[in-house]
UniProtKB/Swiss-Prot annotation:
GO terms for cellular component: cytosol. Catalyzes the oxidation of 5,10-methylenetetrahydrofolate to 5,10-methenyltetrahydrofolate and then the hydrolysis of 5,10-methenyltetrahydrofolate to 10-formyltetrahydrofolate. This is Bifunctional protein FolD. Keywords: Amino-acid biosynthesis, Histidine biosynthesis, Hydrolase, Methionine biosynthesis, Multifunctional enzyme, NADP, One-carbon metabolism, Oxidoreductase, Purine biosynthesis. GO terms for biological process: L-histidine biosynthetic process; methionine biosynthetic process; purine nucleotide biosynthetic process; tetrahydrofolate interconversion. The lineage of its organism: Bacteria, Pseudomonadati, Pseudomonadota, Betaproteobacteria, Burkholderiales. The keyword Hydrolase applies. It comes from Burkholderia orbicola (strain AU 1054). Its EC number is 1.5.1.5, 3.5.4.9. Homodimer. Belongs to the tetrahydrofolate dehydrogenase/cyclohydrolase family. It comes from the Bacteria.
Length: 285
């Protein structure tokens, strides 16, 4: 058996076209969706992510604003800028690129963003709303994974799902979304005693820890769906995920590649969240 590839680029293209249509409709009514992205410091990876987000906005009819600050920016000044953006009616989404310099409390910064503009879905109010099954925004990466399941008709109700990783950005919200869809969910992490015992029983495995080959072919149930959220480099410097792709694709039923799998979906769902925020603002105007 060779797994069917879940192509994040193709699905992302379709969803971005839909987002562009919604953006055009809003703009025609005088409510162009707007996203503000804040970058503090000169982290090369963060600069690439921010550039990709801004380009996605420009390509799909969104207004975008990039604030780039030196790593010496004070926490107080960053919080003051967020307050300004909270009150700016042209801005429907505010994103602070993580990680932040050590002297800035990222939790305090995230909580400073107005929940109705927290398009990353990280604010405690939005995390709590997700927990209760009534989310205002869903964190972009797990939201994108759910869209992948939907697009490929992968049944979640009654499925055994394992999420490897417990971060607030991917692991925990991914588990909640799967649970809300009717899956039986197990969260595994660095303290899990026998990871393979869990994954071999799973119909769905989502690997999201940032560790190469955390999931190998012998750990995959035949026909399972394997979602690789990891972003790593192999010994040759080539981009790879958390899954041993070459081995796992011979056992799994569906699998996402790296690159070209989950990655493109993350920015796409950021656009979708921003559109939803703009539509709510327009309806309330």
């Amino acid at each position: 058996m060779t797994a069917l590839l879940i192509d994040g680029n193709a699905l992302s293209k379709t969803l971005r076209a839909q987002a562009a249509e919604r953006a055009a409709a809003l703009t025609a009514r005088g409510h162009q969706p707007g996203l503000a992205v804040i970058l503090v410091g000169a982290n090369p990876a963060s600069e690439v992510y921010v550039r990709n987000k801004i380009k996605a906005c420009e390509d799909n009819g969104f207004f975008s604003l990039k604030d780039a600050y030196p790593a010496t920016l004070s926490e107080a000044d960053l919080l003051a800028r967020i307050d300004e953006l909270n009150r700016d009616p042209k801005i429907h989404g505010i994103l602070v690129q993580l990680p932040l310099p050590a002297h800035i409390d990222s939790h305090k910064v995230i909580e400073a963003i107005a929940p109705e503009k927290d398009v990353d879905g990280f604010h405690v109010a939005n995390a709590g709303a997700l927990m209760t099954g009534k989310p205002l925004f869903r964190p972009c990466t797990p939201y994108g994974v759910m869209k992948m399941f939907e697009a490929h008709g992968i049944a979640l109700q009654g499925a055994n799902a394992v999420v490897i990783g417990r971060s607030n950005i991917v692991g925990k919200p991914m588990a909640m979304m799967l649970l809300d869809a009717g899956a039986t969910v197990t969260i595994c992490h660095s303290k899990t005693r026998d990871l393979a015992a869990h994954t071999r029983e799973a119909d769905i495995v989502v690997a999201a820890v940032g560790k190469r080959n955390i999931l190998t072919a012998d750990m995959v149930k035949p026909g399972a769906t394997v979602i690789d959220v990891g972003m790593n480099r192999d010994d040759a410097g080539k981009l790879c995920g958390d899954v041993d792709f070459a081995g796992a694709k011979e056992v799994a039923g569906y699998i996402t590649p790296v690159p070209g799998g989950v990655g493109p979906m993350t920015i796409t769902m950021l656009l979708i969240n921003t559109i939803e925020s703009a539509e709510r603002a327009a309806a309330a105007a």
